[in-house]
Amino acid sequence: MNIEIKKQYDLVDYEASVKFMQLRVNEISNNLQKELIWFLSHDHIYTKGTSANENEILKTNDIKIVKTNRGGKTTYHGPGQRIVYFMIDLNSKKKDIRKFITVIEQSLIDFLKNYKINATTFKDRVGIWVTGKDGQTFDKEEKIGAIGLRLQKWITYLSLIHISEPTRPY
């Protein structure tokens, strides 16, 4: 099957998106739907992955906090940030979660190169980090994206790359 690409420009409710992904994963596993890459943004929300700690949120500013079953720590989502959810059937590919994550990370790094933005990953840190722009190296790296992952029957969902912007309400 070909992979469907879905782009949404309005804000999508986080919990509604999770329900949609769970349904889509079931449909993919039963060969009723294509794999999907979904581009969207959420309203202000914190999502807590399976490795989250209570002290990760400095202040909530009345922003909703939702516990998820994806991997990772606490993540802020909000307007202006692009999120990409991958609903990909790894049964039809190599069942290698690390490789899947590496391919997504490298895709973002390669994309940023087109805009003369240097980015990389670090073995001791989670995420994709911007190290410089237009040939200049930054004094401190800035995180631009991270991946949280969940598998159901070897189909990914809640696997996101979270494209950050500097303005965050925390």
What are the residue ranges of the model-derived segments?
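Active-site cofactor/co-catalyst pockets and adjacent glycine-rich loops in catalytic enzymes
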Residues: 148, 154
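Conserved phosphate/anionic-ligand binding catalytic regions in large, soluble enzymes, centered on
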Residues: 155-161
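N-terminal lobe of the biotin/lipoate ligase/transferase fold
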Residues: 1-141, 151
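A translation/RNA-centric and nucleic-acid-associated enzymatic feature enriched
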Residues: 145
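Single conserved hydrophobic/aromatic residue that forms the stacking wall/gate
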Residues: 161-165, 169-170
